[in-house]
Amino acid sequence: MIGDILLFGTLLMNAGAVLNFKLKKKDTQGFGEESKEPSTGDNIREFLLSLRYFRIFIALWNVFMMLCMIVLFGS
């Protein structure tokens, strides 16, 4: 059960890190505009952009997960 959860999290993190969409930050229009709460879409976009910076960490996590799957969860 815990192996399935770790595998699911790893695959989800990999999918987010390798997305190749042109995600752009939302531009502000000027000084007169009041800052609004970021929408859910804006939060998701920011999260995916931040995942791209952690590709090396994600690659090391993948190697660690492969070793765990062989050593701990192998039958």
From Swiss-Prot:
GO annotations of cellular component type = membrane
Its record classes its membrane topology as: Single-pass type I membrane protein
Q: Which UniProt keywords apply?
A: Membrane, Signal, Transmembrane, Transmembrane helix
Matching InterPro entries = SMIM7
Respond yes or no to whether keyword Amino-acid biosynthesis is given for this record. no
The residues forming the signal peptide are 1-17
| Compartment list | Membrane
**What family does this belong to?**
Belongs to the SMIM7 family.
Spell out the protein name for this chain: Small integral membrane protein 7
According to its UniProt entry, this protein's organism is Mus musculus (Mouse)
Q: Which gene is the coding source of this polypeptide chain?
A: Smim7
